[in-house]
């Protein structure tokens, strides 16, 4: 799931790769004003060590493949991460980035994923002048990604940029007023409405891009339902909107008639590839319920989805559910919600995504569980993740998980408050079987203190 970082501060570490990318390559494709950017250098020093450690954790990457991915992030992503935090924030900063490693039961190695909010584009000085939403800067950034990667199709992305980014002067004025008075927690603390996010799957042999759009801004300025706005945007996509519409209609009916609790629609994502192959991904959150019975109702769309893959997926999820919410096996009845450490809020509650392609009859449902809401320490989360990986059949990854965490995050107090793990997501498909994705905060816990500057 796309990560939203609210303060634009920083984080990451030192790794063992021989590659030295401390200065930008002469082949860089980002705008001239971003070259030799001290802000980008700061973010790069923070991101590189964690990436290198997670490559080792995932396994399956050659040194050259790691260098290719690291160079791409250094040259094309770091310049868009925003300004350098100052004072004590520099030593305990959080980057506008989230990294994750995906494990599936049918593959021996994991895959590293990298996602971020481009603060340079969406909150730079230009947003106070002629580009209030950062749309022009976002478009420039997307073109640079397309040039660097080659195999990127922005057909749908351009359409959604136009639909979701607030640019009309009257809408911008209404949004600024709403940001002062009407934002939900914790966004109200920052008086800022995220509108755009992106991610890359950094597979050993390729890079693929995904883009994410947040409907909150448009909902605030138009008064429209965020769910309706997202589903209407899906139906209107060209080409293949008509092939996406049946599942969009099914989800609309489920959320409005048979879902056993209120859900908020927070994101719409797409693969930035040929629309014939691209998935549409709708993200919703539940601040009311997190019981397993509630999850079962969502995965089956109120009993509509009864196919073998859905039922097998629920059976496996049931076997690890106690690990994901940090309770003893059998302790939590299926009908009971698991109390969270903090009052659930945006990004601090249970999330689901529904993804489908044109022509699909049903969506694939994924679940996202905020680990820091249920466990007291990263060590406990690591123990639960190791047990979950073992059930996935990934014994080697399970055995080495805590060791990798210690190596990748050398400054982390694993027995203190949670500072490393964000979420664990789960899904099951007939093609891949069960899979888990573990999401990590990108912060200075991965960096020796004297390496931040």
From Swiss-Prot:
Positions bound to substrate: 210, 212, 279, 281, 283, 368, 435
One of the record's GO molecular function terms: transferase activity, transferring alkyl or aryl (other than methyl) groups
Temperature dependence: Optimum temperature is 50 degrees Celsius.
Pathway info: Mycotoxin biosynthesis
EC identifiers of the protein: 2.5.1.-
Enzyme type, top EC level: transferase
pH sensitivity of activity: Optimum pH is 8.0.
Alphabetical UniProt keywords: Transferase
Domain of life where this protein originates: Eukaryota
InterPro entries from the UniProt entry: Aro_prenylTrfase, Aro_prenylTrfase_DMATS
Family statement drawn from the similarity comment of this UniProt entry: Belongs to the tryptophan dimethylallyltransferase family.
Protein name: O-glucose prenyltransferase PaPT
Annotated gene: PaPT
